Amino acid sequence: MKWVGDARLAAGPEAAWYLETAFTPGAYLGTVYDDPTTPIVVTGIEEVTTIRVPSGRLVVDAPFDDDDVSRYEQGLPTRPPRELAVSIPPGVHRVEIAWTAGPYEFFGEHFDGVECAATRLRISDDPVIGWVMGLGVEDDVARLQPGEEPRFYSDANVGCFADAGAWTTLSAPFRAFKDGIPVPRETERLPGWCERVRDESQQADLVMFTAESGGVVWLGRTKTGDVATIVVTSGMPGTKA
């Protein structure tokens, strides 16, 4: 039987188009802000790293919250991370970035306009037939208001994929502050301003990526309903998802 998603969570036509087009090299994704004559083109898809998720439970959230800095310093409890209600196959999965370019001029200086359009966790290579918003374990679809989009938030304009079972250890480097100032963290620097933290004791990882103000977590479903990919857009101007 073919999978049929919940209409309350389904991507609209513009969002579905954006999610598909962002990962199609050579496709036009829009035009440069304030210059409708210059297209924004998808230049390529880059695999920036892999991530280990041994528990099959996935957090997609900001790795830290600016509002909780004082609690981090005092060692006080903070809110739990936004763990997705859907589980994924335990194992190693690819993290990929969709790159775009839209050249522009600013005060006489020329820029290539290279941007990250979206970041995805690739679960399988099976074709996606539909997109739905991913709920967190504490979300209730029955309580969603018309037009409301479940999402995570980030004052620092970042998000992350992480194994939920190792969250405390994996997020710790991002939550080290002194006098309100972040302590330099020892993370693995990756392309596209991404970072990775490893927990070898649990064979689990966290990968941080750019996400303007956070974002909706989109699940790409196959004809059988399996999750093939999980996408967060970067929130660049003109983003439709």
Where are the regions a protein language model picked out?
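N-terminal domain-onset segments
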Residues: 1-241
